[in-house]
């Protein structure tokens, strides 16, 4: 028998992967350079604004950004990592939901009516909120701080601590001095009859 010759396929033409990778790297570097130029131009603009705010003299001439761009173009060999973008402005913390009143920074000069309201007022009746106060105090076990925050959040009214203490004392089963039923006369008559 005649020896069979193995059919050998010619090797595939070499792909220019190296050229492909180089072209991708060049594209990435071009994009990075453009981004850096954009950041540089933003930095220069912000610096120019800061300088113009500090010294308003019109005789100060700013250098043109074109020569600086040529000097700031990094070479491929020296660039190891892209520069981080400039820091964002510091955000103020969100206002807590349980804080009340106006902050000093909101308005420079409050309206005259608000100045009058800031003064101490006389007696105010909390009777309209009695049911909400008593129910909240009973549900939270007489915790004044929690009841204050809860009522402020859900009813939008900042109840004074002394009012909550008063209603806890009168209507709460957790305090010994309170009647627990809401009626002052029934608790005192039972104490007199037994004692």
Swiss-Prot record:
Comp. bias (Acidic residues): 15-53
Induction: Expressed at the late phase of the viral replicative cycle. Probably already expressed from the early to late transition.
Keywords: Activator, Host nucleus, Host-virus interaction, Late protein, Repressor, Transcription, Transcription regulation, Viral genome packaging, Viral release from host cell
InterPro entries, A to Z: Adeno_L4-33K/L4-22K (IPR021304)
Region feature Disordered, mapped onto this chain: 1-124
Pfam families noted in UniProt: Adeno_L433K_22K
Compositional bias annotation for Low complexity: 54-63
Family under the similarity heading: Belongs to the adenoviridae splicing factor family.
Protein name: Packaging protein 2
UniProt source species: Human adenovirus C serotype 2 (HAdV-2)
Upper taxonomic lineage: Viruses, Varidnaviria, Bamfordvirae, Preplasmiviricota, Tectiliviricetes
């Amino acid at each position: 028998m005649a020896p069979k010759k193995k059919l050998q396929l010619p090797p595939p033409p070499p792909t220019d992967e190296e050229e492909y990778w180089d072209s991708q790297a060049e594209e990435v570097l071009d994009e990075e350079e453009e981004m850096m130029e954009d950041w540089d131009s933003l930095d220069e603009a912000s610096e120019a604004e800061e300088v113009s705010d500090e010294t308003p003299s019109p005789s100060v001439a700013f250098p043109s950004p074109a020569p600086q761009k040529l000097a700031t173009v990094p070479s491929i060999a020296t660039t190891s990592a892209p520069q981080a973008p400039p820091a964002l402005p510091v955000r103020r913390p969100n206002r807590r939901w349980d804080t009340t009143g106006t902050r000093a920074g909101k308005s420079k000069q409050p309206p005259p009516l608000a100045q009058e309201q800031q003064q101490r007022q006389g007696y105010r009746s909390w009777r309209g909120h009695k049911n909400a106060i008593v129910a909240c105090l009973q549900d939270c076990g007489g915790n004044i701080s929690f009841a204050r925050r809860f009522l402020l959040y859900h009813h939008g009214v900042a109840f004074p601590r002394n009012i909550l203490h008063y209603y806890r004392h009168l209507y709460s089963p957790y305090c010994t001095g309170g009647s627990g039923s809401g009626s002052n006369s029934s608790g005192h008559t039972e104490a007199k009859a037994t004692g």
